[in-house]
C-alpha cells in the first residue's frame, strides 16, 4: 500500500525539482506522481531517480533547496536559502512533517537551525561547505552544565547545523557530505586568536527522537556530532574524517543524553572517536543531568593521539549504563579510557565493553583520576568522582606498547573493575612493565599478560565472569520505516 502526497508546498518557483515522500509497507513500487499546479492543471512528471532509505519517520511534504534560491556552485552563500526553507517547511509539522532535499552540488552555508518533524536529506553528490566568514556563525551562551566555553571563557559559535527544543528530527542522506573546512578554525585555536569556542558540525539541544545517519562528515572546526540534554537518539552509518593532529575533532559526543544508539560508524579523528560527557565541575554537578542508557556497536576508530571510547573528562553529571560491543581500534592511543579528577564529582558506573579488537595501541586500557583542567577556580576540591562497576571482556589486542595504565585517586579508589578473557600481544619494544595499577580494586580471569595484584585472577573457569546485560535498552526497540522519494523534473 502506498500513501501518496495530497498537498503541494505553495509559492515555489516553476520549473522546479520536486521531491516526494511516501511510506512503503513492503517494497518500493514504481509510480507516476502528479503535481497540481497553481491554476488547477495537472501534468505528468518524469521520474529521474528514486531514493529509498530507513528512518524513524517519513514525511508528507517535501521541497528542494533550489526552490528557495539555493545555488550549488561552491561560491554562492546559501545560508538564507536554508533558513527560508526550514521556516517554510516548519508550517507542515502538524500535517505529516516535511523534508528538505539537498541535490548534487557544493552548497556553501553558514549556521542554520532545524525545526521539528523535519528531515534534511543530502544527495550522495551533495556537499555542504561551511562558510569561512565568521559573521555567518552567530554566538550563543555557554552550555549551562559547562559554565563557560571550552576554547574561551565567553560564549560559543553556533554549530553549522543546529537545533534546540525539537522533536522528531532527521539528518540523513545517500552518504552526502558535510565539510566543516576547519583549517581556519584550527589555525585560530593554535594561535590563541579565538574569542569564542569553535563551532561543531551538528548540535541538537533539549531535543527528542533524533536520527543522524548515512553521512560523511569532514574537517569539523571542533567536535563533529554533539547531542546534548536530549533523548532517544539514533546515530547510524556515519563516516567522520579529520586529520589526526587536528585539535579536539572528537567524533560523536553524547552529552547529558538518555537512550542513545551509535552503530556502524567509521571515524578517523584528532581526538576521541566517541567521548561520553555530562558537564564540567561545579556546573555539571549543579545541572545534574547524566548520560545513561548508551549503546555503541560496530564502531571502527583510528585515533593515534586519543581514545576509541572515552568516558569523561567532563562527567560531573554522571555516566551510567554504557554498553559497547564489536569495536575495532586501529593505531589509537587507548581502547577504553576513563578520564576524571578531583573536583569533577559525578560518577562513571555500570560500564560494559565486549568483543573489541585492537591493533597498534599505546594502551589497551587507561583510567586516570588526574586528568583535565577546571572550568574556573570555584570548583569543589572535595568533589570526588565515583568510578565503579567497569566490565571489560572478550578482547584481543596486537602490537600494544603497554597493556594498561590504571590510576585511581588516593583515598578514592576506582572499584568493581572486572577484566576477563582478554589477550594482549605486546609490541617488540613494549614497556618492561605491561600493567601499572594504583588505587584501583577489582578482579580478572583469563587475562594475558597477567594483570596487577590488585586485580587478582579468579581462574580460567571464570573467563565469562564480567557482566554484560542481557536485556535490551529502549533505544534498541526502535523500528525504522521505509521512506521513498521520487525526484521529478518538470520542464
From Swiss-Prot:
Subcellular location: Membrane
EC code(s) of this entry: 3.2.1.15
Residue ranges crossing the lipid bilayer per the database entry: 15-35
UniProt superkingdom: Eukaryota
Active site residues according to the UniProt entry: 271 (proton donor)
Gene Ontology annotations of biological process type: carbohydrate metabolic process
SUPFAM superfamilies: Pectin lyase-like
Pfam families in the record: Glyco_hydro_28
Keywords attached to this entry: Glycoprotein, Glycosidase, Hydrolase, Membrane, Repeat, Transmembrane, Transmembrane helix
GO molecular function, a single term: polygalacturonase activity
Record protein name field: Probable polygalacturonase
Organism: Vitis vinifera (Grape)
Amino acid at each position: 500500500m502506498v500513501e501518496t502526497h495530497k498537498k503541494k508546498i505553495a509559492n515555489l518557483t516553476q520549473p522546479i525539482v520536486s521531491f516526494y515522500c511516501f511510506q512503503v509497507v513492503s517494497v518500493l513500487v514504481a509510480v507516476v506522481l502528479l503535481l497540481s499546479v497553481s491554476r488547477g492543471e495537472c501534468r505528468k512528471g518524469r521520474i529521474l531517480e528514486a531514493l529509498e532509505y530507513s528512518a524513524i519517520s517519513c514525511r508528507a511534504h517535501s521541497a528542494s533547496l533550489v526552490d528557495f534560491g539555493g545555488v550549488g556552485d561552491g561560491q554562492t552563500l546559501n545560508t538564507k536559502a536554508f533558513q527560508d526553507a526550514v521556516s517554510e517547511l516548519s508550517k507542515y509539522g502538524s500535517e505529516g512533517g516535511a523534508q528538505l532535499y539537498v541535490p548534487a552540488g557544493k552548497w556553501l552555508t553558514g549556521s542554520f537551525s532545524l525545526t521539528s518533524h523535519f528531515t534534511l536529506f543530502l544527495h550522495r553528490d551533495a556537499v555542504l561547505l561551511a562558510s569561512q566568514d565568521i559573521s555567518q556563525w552567530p554566538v550563543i551562551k555557554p552550555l549551562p552544565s559547562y559554565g563557560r566555553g571550552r576554547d574561551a571563557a565567553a560564549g560559543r559559535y553556533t554549530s553549522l547545523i543546529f537545533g534546540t527544543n525539537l522533536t522528531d528530527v532527521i539528518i540523513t542522506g545517500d552518504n552526502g557530505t558535510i565539510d566543516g573546512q576547519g583549517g581556519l578554525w584550527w589555525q585560530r585555536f593554535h594561535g590563541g586568536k579565538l574569542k569564542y569556542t569553535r563551532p561543531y558540525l551538528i548540535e541538537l539541544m533539549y531535543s527528542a527522537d533524533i536520527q543522524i545517519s548515512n553521512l560523511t562528515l569532514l574537517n569539523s572546526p571542533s567536535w563533529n556530532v554533539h547531542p546534548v540534554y536530549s533523548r532517544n537518539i539514533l546515530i547510524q552509518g556515519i563516516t567522520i574524517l579529520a586529520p589526526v593532529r587536528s585539535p579536539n575533532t572528537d567524533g560523536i559526543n553524547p552529552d547529558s543524553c538518555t537512550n542513545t544508539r551509535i552503530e556502524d560508524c567509521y571515524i578517523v579523528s584528532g581526538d576521541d572517536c566517541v567521548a561520553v560527557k555530562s558537564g564540567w565541575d561545579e556546573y555539571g554537578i549543579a545541572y545534574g543531568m547524566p548520560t545513561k542508557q548508551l549503546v555503541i556497536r560496530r564502531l571502527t576508530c583510528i585515533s593515534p593521539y586519543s581514545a576509541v571510547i572515552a568516558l569523561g573528562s567532563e562527567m560531573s553529571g554522571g555516566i551510567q549504563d554504557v554498553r559497547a560491543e564489536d569495536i575495532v581500534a586501529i593505531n589509537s592511543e587507548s581502547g577504553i579510557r576513563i578520564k576524571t579528577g578531583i573536583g569533577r564529582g559525578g560518577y562513571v558506573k555500570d560500564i560494559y565493553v565486549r568483543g573489541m579488537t585492537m591493533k597498534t595501541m599505546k594502551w589497551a586500557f587507561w583510567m586516570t583520576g588526574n586528568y583535565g583542567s577546571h572550568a574556573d577556580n570555584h570548583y569543589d576540591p572535595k568533589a570526588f568522582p565515583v568510578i565503579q562497576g567497569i566490565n571489560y571482556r572478550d578482547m584481543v589486542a596486537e602490537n600494544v606498547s603497554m597493556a594498561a595504565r590504571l590510576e585511581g585517586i588516593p583515598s578514592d579508589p576506582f572499584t568493581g573493575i572486572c577484566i576477563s578473557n582478554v589477550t594482549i600481544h605486546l609490541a617488540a619494544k613494549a614497556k618492561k612493565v605491561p600493567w601499572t595499577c594504583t588505587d584501583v580494586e577489582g578482579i580478572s580471569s583469563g587475562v594475558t599478560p597477567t594483570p596487577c595484584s590488585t586485580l587478582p585472577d579468579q581462574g580460567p573457569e571464570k573467563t565469562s565472569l564480567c557482566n554484560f546485560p542481557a536485556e535490551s535498552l529502549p533505544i534498541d526497540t526502535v523500528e525504522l520505516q521505509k521512506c521513498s522519494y521520487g525526484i521529478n523534473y518538470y520542464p
